[in-house]
């Protein structure tokens, strides 16, 4: 990995301040951020070409506060501009609606619906999966889908 790539990943993933610290002294969220940066660096290790590569992230925001969750998902979304594909498992429907291009809604290990956010996250499908009334509507000010019970 060239130093420019290293610096870009370290800065964009927000782990620069964690470099001097021992891994065992980091919190769960800090470890999560370091692992994400490490994954990006490993993807870059065979050159700068990310096209055709994929990153699987299973609940990458589980130990993160909202600011770091937004930062990590924004960076994940930005990497798609460089050809890197991502499969992200999230249980936070609003984060999925905000950052996903396509969504797979699953229930008990089966795919219930597959497609873009507007198609997958409709009131009927969500209410059926979660067995409670779920409302998904476009927020006029935010100009994105917002989901609530």
Where does each model-flagged region fall?
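H-loop/switch region of ABC-family ATPase nucleotide-binding domains
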Residues: 90-91
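Conserved ABC ATPase signature
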Residues: 22-26, 30
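A short, surface-exposed alpha-helical micro-motif characterized by mixed small hydrophobic
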Residues: 96-98
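ABC ATPase nucleotide-binding domains
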Residues: 127-149
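Helical segment within the ABC ATPase nucleotide-binding domain
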Residues: 45, 69-82
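Catalytic Walker B motif of ABC-type/P-loop ATPase nucleotide-binding domains
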Residues: 49-50, 55-59
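Conserved ABC ATPase "signature" region
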Residues: 2-18
